[in-house]
Amino acid sequence: MQRLTVEQFREAGKTPLVVVLDDVRSMYNVGSVFRTGDAFRIEALYLCGISATPPATEIHKTALGAEDSVAWRHFDNALEAVELLKGQGYEVLAVEQCDGSTKLNEFIPIKGKPYAVVLGNEVKGVHQEVRDACDACLEIPQFGTKHSMNVSVTAGIIMYKFVF
């Protein structure tokens, strides 16, 4: 298997997807999202609020160096990131169980269209004001008792949907 160098990755074409983390508290989750973002060659990862930023040992432990390949940026809050992305022509989707949310299996992304997905805090989810600023909500259908998943697992499922 041929792997890209960090430099080759930075120059390679990207999936037109920005992942926005809204106050994700676990550095291990942040690192896992970096690693999955590298695997799916996303455009960027926006770390907002209390979401940790590199360099951090805990991020590196799960990212395995993907924090060096995936473009990232920090915002004081996710609302700033959402407003910027919308101004740049992205369709911004909160990944959250909301009234009127679209089930992920029913959502068909338009190839080549720029999207951003907002994933929320492990306990509180996406802040209400951020959800309100998004164009729509996506929901992963679930059948268990918890009706929630780890944010890094959710990120992987969502990224896969936009690539394939």
Predicted regions and their residues:
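Post-transcriptional modification and biogenesis factors for structured RNAs
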Residues: 1-164
